[in-house]
A protein has these predicted regions:
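Nucleotide-activated chemistry modules centered on ATP-dependent adenylation/adenylyltransferase
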Residues: 1-149
Length: 149
């Protein structure tokens, strides 16, 4: 939403960039698909360290949702627990970037910015851009992000 005034400083509390129930929706869809396909593992890339105040990126939320899906699905009631895996939850941005780099992720095809321009250039000033820049710097890797300035 281009009308949102995205802050350039990280503040305490839930930021204006919060998307209501985003991870609840993602995990609900993943749980339904997993149950239908007889898969008992769900993966989600939440991160509590650099989470910018989003409540659905915390371990408490993930644990609560895991209990919910196992109480509210046939799979869970039948005793075949669905697992939610969060491999990035305790990693720093630097470590996430290194991990992805080692897996061959092409970071030029990814974005973090909340205020991309029409050409896909990142603002370079929002908290997501700042965390990304710092992560690449600390990881000792070149940041392929196209920034406006």
């Amino acid at each position: 939403d281009t009308e949102i005034n995205v802050p350039t400083e990280m503040n305490a509390g839930i930021p204006v960039t919060y998307v209501p129930a985003r991870n609840t929706i993602f995990l609900s869809i993943a749980a339904a698909y997993a149950e239908k396909m007889s898969i008992n593992q769900i993966f989600i890339g939440v991160n509590q360290i650099d989470y910018s105040g989003y409540p659905d990126c915390r371990p408490d939320f993930i644990d609560s949702f895991k209990r919910t899906i196992n109480l509210g699905t046939k799979t869970g009631v039948d005793g075949k627990q669905l697992e939610i895996n969060t491999p990035l939850i305790n990693m720093s941005k630097k470590d996430i970037i290194r991990y992805g780099h080692n897996m061959g992720i092409d970071y030029s095809q990814t974005v973090s910015c909340y205020q991309l321009d029409r050409e896909g250039n990142a603002c370079g000033h929002c908290d997501a851009c700042k965390l990304r820049k710092e992560g690449f710097l600390l990881a000792g890797l070149e940041d392929p992000t196209r920034y406006k300035n």
